[in-house]
Structure formats: C-alpha cells, structure tokens
Amino acid sequence: ILILVGLTIYNITYVNPYDFTVRKETIKSNKIDDNTNGLIIAYFSDIHYGTFINEKHLKTIEEKINKFDPDIIIFGGDLFDSALNGNDQSKLSEFLRALEAKYGKYAILGDKDNEYIEQVKSILTDTDFRILDNQNEKIYVNGSYINLVGLNTNADVINAYDGVNPSNFTFAISHYPDNLDKVDFTKTDYMLAGHSLNGQVYIP
C-alpha cells in the first residue's frame, strides 16, 4: 500500500524519444485537508505524435501513467505537429481513452495544437478530456475540492481565475513557462508548464 502525504505529482517526461522518465513531486500544504490528502496526479506534455512519439511510445506512456492509478490526469499541450490521417488519429485516441483517472482527465492547448485546433479538440473531448481554455475547474473529493486553472497560449489570467477561492489549494497549468510572470501567486499554490520538452514545475 502506498501512503502519500499531501498531493503527489507524477510528471511523465522524456530525455529523448526512447528514454521516458517519471519524476515524483510530493506537495504539502495546510490547504490540503483529510479529503484531498493523498491525491495522485499524473501530468504529461508535448507528445508531438508522429514527430517524437510513435505508437510504441504511446503504449509505454500509457503503462507508466496507469501504473500509478492516478486520481487526476493532466495533459499539458502539443498533441501532434501536423494533421493526422484517420489511422493515426485512431491510434492517438485509443491511447488517450485508455488513460484512467477517478476524478477526471484535463488538458490545455499548446502552440502546435492551435494550428490544428478542431482536430485536437475533437480528439481530446472524444476521449473524455476536459479542455481548460483560460478557465478553472473545481475538482471535488468527498465534499472538499481543489482548484485547477488552465491557461492557454494567450493567457487571460482574469478569466482563468474567475471564481477561484484562494482558501482552497490551487493548481495552475500552462503550456508556456513564460506565463509564470502573469500568474497571481497569491491565488496559486503550484504551477506546471510544458513546452520545454522536459517539463517545468514551480512552487512559490
């Protein structure tokens, strides 16, 4: 039995297309109560399917994520680099659909996603990912909740944080690490960013 104190982030990254790693971060905060304590969150980003990642790699990532039985899964943007044919779209959708999370799967869009936005949105929504486009979501766990704020590539912080109660633990996710300068850390406890192709984490 794995007993975790606080929230645990499993950050799935890769050094090169053949070397996937899992980095574990354990978060402690007085905003995490008994109900939200022990949540496991899996974060992955920058798939760039067809450029860096093929079908075999997708299976490896799927196994690494599902191995930890995450409560929440977050995708940090850049799903693929060029329009997918039907066969590749089916393979990518199969991978995303196979990911399992008790309290939901969430995504933000990256710069590459904006080039093929309708296809990306269709794939993500059809595989049960909720896209946070300068929006936030309350994730309820046994009557308590944490905030998840999603910033797109043109971050609109006012809209993204609308209604966020800073008394509750708040995650911000952004594809661009540069959005860090725009975030109000009086309302943010933890931020995750992609785009660097090896993930970035910021704890204020």
Show the residue positions of the predicted features:
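Membrane-embedded segments
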Residues: 18, 35-130
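Acidic, histidine-bearing metal-coordination/catalytic regions of metal-dependent phosphoesterases
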Residues: 1-40
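A secondary-structure boundary/capping signal
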Residues: 23, 28, 43-45, 76, ...
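Sparse, context-dependent recognition of short Cys/His-centered cofactor- or disulfide-binding micro-motifs
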Residues: 5-12, 84, 133, 157
